[in-house]
């Protein structure tokens, strides 16, 4: 079974809530809305949902190419509800993560609704991010 390690680095300073993100030859940033942050970039939660949407799109395109489907587009809208009081430390009576994540997907391709539903099931099955959300992956926090 071929395996690939994917690595990223992130850092924050005492100056603000902007987080610098680096991977390969890319540098991005994350921020928080005002008043905590400067509202100059998406939040970590938004990036998380962006990543799931992007994975849905790219896995869908890969499957379409493999099956020779004349895919015109895949459009994804995602939302999730979260208790911000928990992550801000105002309560301990809940959990930090999203309660539920809804992935609304439009597939523009010459397929029946049933075929589109089957394609969406295959996308969900093959998307690594969906897998990591639905199946618990061990996360190790290691102090360096």
Please report, for each region that a protein language model flagged, where it lies by residue.
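Extended beta-strand/beta-hairpin segments
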Residues: 1-50, 62-144
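Alpha-helical metal-binding/catalytic segments enriched in His/Glu/Asp
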Residues: 52-56
């Amino acid at each position: 079974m071929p395996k690939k390690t994917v690595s990223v680095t992130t850092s924050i300073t005492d100056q603000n809530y902007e987080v610098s993100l680096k991977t390969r030859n890319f540098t991005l940033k994350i921020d928080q809305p005002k008043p905590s942050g400067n509202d100059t970039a998406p939040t970590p939660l938004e990036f998380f949902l962006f990543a799931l949407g992007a994975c849905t799109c790219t896995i869908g395109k890969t499957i379409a190419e493999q099956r020779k489907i004349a895919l015109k587009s895949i459009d994804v809208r995602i939302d999730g509800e979260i208790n911000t009081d928990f992550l801000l430390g105002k309560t301990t009576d809940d959990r930090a993560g999203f309660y539920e994540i809804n992935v609304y997907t439009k597939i523009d391709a010459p397929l029946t609704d049933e075929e589109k539903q089957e394609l969406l099931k295959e996308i969900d099955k093959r998307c690594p991010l969906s897998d990591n959300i639905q199946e618990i992956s061990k996360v190790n926090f290691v102090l360096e």
